[in-house]
Structures are given as structure tokens and as C-alpha cells.
Amino acid sequence: MKVLQLIDSLEAGGAERVAVNYANGLVHMIDASYLCTTRAEGLLKGELNKDVGYLFLNKKKTIDVKAIKRLHQFIKNEDIDIIHAHGSSFFLATLIKLLQPKLKLVWHDHYGKSEFLKHRPKQMLKLCSRFFNHIFSVNSKLETWAKTTLKVKSVSYLPNYAVKNNNALTTKLKGVEGKRIVCLANLRPQKDHLNLLKAFKAVLKTEPMWTLHLVGQDFNDAYSKSIFEFINLNKLETSVFIYGSCADTSAILQQCTIGVLSSKSEGLPLALLEYGLAGLPVISTNVGDCSLVICDVKEGKLIPSENTIALQKAMLHFISDLKQAKTVGNHLKNKVEHSFSEASALKKIRLLYQTITS
């Protein structure tokens, strides 16, 4: 059995990390594991296992005939059985299946705005879903949506899992050791960094030595500009630091004391699982399937989204008792290692692959 993971880029986002994790994890579980990135390469290319077959299409437009031909020929030459398409790459995968009807197509839905599914564009997805052999959804809301909206019978919920990357530390965080709060999230509106900044500004009134560290891709857009403007306007330049995309996230988290997610909407965020693997005490908004990871107060703090005061209080609570915070972090680490493991997820994936190809 030969399987190709299809993804739009290898920038350090959640769906991209999942595609790389699957390609790497399946190397010794199936006959051959491949990854194709369609539009762009990125930081995560360096994390691919040397035994993963790799293709970069450099696709320039939605229907790029040259890219379609290259992928079609690659799949033919390598005798690939399954395309596992992540996110918006479903369209290209569908075109390839039309050219090779015997090919099996699995779509992985990573949609990050699961709180706002009513506004999700679905016409093209609905059309293409007729050609899907299976859909994996990253949270239960997306699973229900796929079952009721799309034209495919086989749908299942598959939680994300995180793996520690072994990249050497290259990013030295600013601030005082033991007083760092980290937010691992690309600079997108649904991540609601502005709410976090407002809450952290209030924290600084009583805890001026603490610092906030934002790690994630900067798209240099209006949202990004609003974050920098807030920092400058409120004179937070010596307390809040922005690093952009980083390949050494596991090493970065080892330098931090508290992990935070302030999102308005999520699927099942990889950042939450990465915080857990690092043993960090975590504060997260109660969106998507975050409550499946943090089930009670022993495992972290779940707060309402867009609630600055609740976020401020949660940060101050951990800061006021770091010993208890460390215990909470250890409980979450145990939970993530046992309930969101790589081994159990890959076993489910391989079983599904075997089912659709038999």
C-alpha cells in the first residue's frame, strides 16, 4: 500500500504539521509514504523523514495544467494507491481522481472556524465530495457537518496528535526565565491575539516582570498590523515579543512557563497538544474540541472566548502559584501522552486505508 499526503504548503501551520506527521509516521507502517506540497515549501520541509518520497508542484493557479500533469505522472510512476488530501487541496486531488478513477481519495477536514460553519463556502466541496472514499474530521462538529452536508457515506472523527520535533534550539526567547507566557498560533483573526494582549496588559499592572511570546506565521496583513499597533500604542515593546514562524517549537516551549490559546474558533489545536507534551500549564478558550483535551481543572483552565477578564484572571491564578501550575502541566502531559498518541492515530489511519483498498 502506497499513500501520498497532499497539502498546499509546508509553512508551520496545524494542517501542514499533521500532513508531515502522517507522512513521517507511516514510513515503516506501509509500503511507501509520500508527501506532495502544491503551492509552496516552507519550514516544515526540514522535518520530513528522509524515507518519505517528496514532490513540490509549484502550482501557480487553481487549474494549473502543468502541475496537474506532473502530479498525475508522479502517482502513475510510483504506483500510489491513496491520496490523503488535507484542507483545500481536495480540489486538485479530485481532478487527479478523475484522471485515475481507481485511485482512492481520503479528505482530511482541518477547518479552523468550526464555530462558524454556517458561513463556510461549500458548493465546490459538495461537488467534489462525491469522489471521496472517506473523510477524516478534526473535531466532532466538523464530523457532523460532513455527514449532513456532503455527498459521502464514510466519515469519522480523528483527533490530532503532536510529536516533539528534535530541531536544535535556534530561537532564544527574551525576558526572564520562569516568567514567560507563550502563544503558539499563526497571526490569524480567529486566534484573537488582541484579546490576549488586552488581558496580558492588565496582568502587567501587578506582574511587570512577566513577558508574552507570540510564535507563529505573520501574514503581514491588516490583522497583523493591528497587533503591532496595539503593542506600540500601549508601550508593550519590552513585554511582548513576536517571533514569526519557528522550526524549533519544542525547544521554544521548554523555555516557557505557561501556554495560552485565546482563539474564537478551533478544530482540535495542535498547539494545545504541544503545550501538553512540553508539560506546560495551559489556559485555553473553550472552543472546538479543546474540552476533550482539558476535561477538568486538574488538566488546565478552560475559559469563555472573547472574555478578557477571564483570561487575565486565569493567567494571574497560575502566576500566583507556580508550584500548583507545574502540577497541572504534568497532569496534562500524562493526558496527551496517553489519549492523543501517535501510535493510536496511525493505527486507525492504516486500518481505514486497508478498508478502502480491499
Label for each model-derived stretch:
Residues 132-157, 162-167:
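A short, active-site helix/loop in glycosyltransferases that binds the activated sugar's phosphate group
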Residues 296-297, 301-309, 317-323:
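Conserved acidic donor-binding segment of nucleotide-sugar-dependent glycosyltransferases
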Residues 281-284, 294:
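Short hydrophobic beta-strand element within catalytic cores of glycosyltransferases
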Residues 106-134, 149-150:
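A conserved, positively charged/aromatic
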Residues 4-6, 174-191, 197-200, 213:
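Conserved donor-binding/catalytic core segment of Leloir-type glycosyltransferases
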Residues 245, 264:
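Aromatic "clamp/platform" in nucleotide-sugar-dependent glycosyltransferases that forms part
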Residues 13-21, 188-205, 212, 222-225, ...:
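A conserved mid-protein helix/loop that constitutes part of the nucleotide-sugar donor-binding site
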Residues 85-92, 109:
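Short His-centered aromatic/hydrophobic patch
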